[in-house]
């Protein structure tokens, strides 16, 4: 089998994770920490791309990586327009939306740009894989009870789909032939109904839907939320933080550290025990609801993400849902590996690269 050498790039707010893979085998994985003062000089996140590019090239050189031997570069997908899952070739339309922050400004927008900037000089393809804006929801799943307020698909697409493919392989099937309920449990928690390779429904793990998590509130009593918003006690930004960043375990018990909470549970702390059980309860409840989306025809339930390392949490969830289907646990996440695998499927011609297309009437992002 021929060897495809792939450079993968995953930009974060103050760091850039890079990896070099020979097919599935990691040759190099490194987290480049950026000086906060250095990146603070740039008015916009997008203006950092030249600085980050040079830093990446310097690190590769220091490790003896000859970039002329690369076959492709793959970056983390950013806040683009809603698109179906898959591996996309970075094109002009995508670059424009990433640079303009069409669906928002985030460090992940640099992924496709950095991939293109490095790949174009080497005359090799640049890709992105399964960004958070992946939207494969069925029309019936979009409807909410208020006109003009559509449900949105924002979830851990990269890890959910990567793990779903691993589970399919484990079950000796293609991902596209299975019905899976995949739950990513990290700082946020999302439960996706994967129907024959498409995530036809999923809770919005960012903006207050689904189970509460270490730092997100999830679904809360809407009437009480409205009252709190108009109480005059909070600014808008404070309310947003209550939903994302200061919600969930942070609000309920004062920490987003699930390991710390688990130790409290093990010591018999009644409050920690109830709250941790409640989080598992809400995850199980979301999985149960998602099973109805797939008419109860589920090949497996998958638990992944950092919280899937928690035996207490996993056992609580299993106890409530293992009657639906077998529960398979794939703890942690590996975004670099997932990006490399997405590029590799295209290089091996196992799937065709997708094209990012902008429709003329599409002037604002849906999502």
Curated annotation (Swiss-Prot):
Domain of life, source organism: Bacteria
Keywords, in A-Z order: ATP-binding, Cytoplasm, Kinase, Nucleotide-binding, Transferase
GO cellular component, one term: cytoplasm
Enzyme class of the recorded protein, top EC level: transferase
MF (Gene Ontology): acetate kinase activity; ATP binding; butyrate kinase activity
Assigned EC number: 2.7.2.7
Cited PROSITE patterns: ACETATE_KINASE_1, ACETATE_KINASE_2
Record protein name field: Probable butyrate kinase
Source lineage: Bacteria, Bacillati, Bacillota, Bacilli, Bacillales
């Amino acid at each position: 089998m021929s060897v495809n050498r792939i450079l993968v790039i995953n930009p974060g707010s103050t760091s850039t994770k890079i990896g070099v893979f020979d097919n599935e085998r990691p040759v190099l994985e490194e987290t480049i920490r950026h000086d906060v003062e250095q990146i603070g000089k740039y008015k916009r996140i997008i203006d950092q791309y030249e600085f980050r590019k040079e830093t990446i090239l310097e690190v590769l050189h220091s490790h003896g990586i000859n970039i002329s031997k690369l076959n492709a570069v793959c970056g983390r997908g950013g806040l683009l327009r809603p698109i179906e899952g898959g591996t996309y070739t970075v094109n002009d339309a995508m670059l424009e939306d990433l640079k303009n922050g069409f669906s928002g400004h985030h460090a992940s927008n640099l992924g496709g740009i950095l991939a293109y900037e490095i790949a174009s000089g080497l005359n090799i393809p640049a890709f992105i894989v399964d960004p958070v804006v992946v939207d494969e929801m069925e029309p019936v799943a979009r409807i909410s009870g208020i006109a003009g307020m559509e449900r949105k698909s924002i979830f851990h697409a990269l890890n959910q789909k990567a793990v779903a493919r691993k589970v399919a392989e484990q079950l000796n099937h293609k991902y596209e032939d299975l019905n899976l309920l995949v739950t990513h449990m990290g700082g946020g928690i999302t439960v996706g109904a994967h129907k024959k390779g498409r995530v036809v429904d999923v809770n919005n793990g960012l903006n207050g839907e689904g189970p509460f998590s270490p730092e997100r509130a999830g679904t809360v009593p809407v009437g009480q939320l409205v009252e709190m918003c108009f109480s005059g006690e909070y600014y808008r930004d404070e309310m947003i933080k209550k939903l994302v960043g200061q919600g969930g375990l942070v609000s309920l018990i004062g920490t987003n550290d699930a390991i710390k909470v688990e130790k409290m549970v093990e010591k018999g702390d009644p409050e920690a025990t109830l709250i941790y059980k409640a989080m598992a309860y809400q995850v199980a409840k979301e999985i149960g609801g998602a099973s109805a989306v797939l008419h109860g025809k589920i090949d497996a339930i998958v638990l992944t993400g950092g919280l899937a390392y928690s035996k207490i949490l996993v056992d609580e969830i299993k106890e409530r849902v293992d009657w639906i289907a077998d529960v398979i646990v794939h703890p942690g996440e590996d975004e670099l590996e997932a990006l490399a695998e997405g590029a590799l499927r295209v290089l091996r011609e196992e799937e065709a690269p997708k094209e990012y297309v902008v429709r003329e009437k599409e002037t604002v992002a849906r999502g």
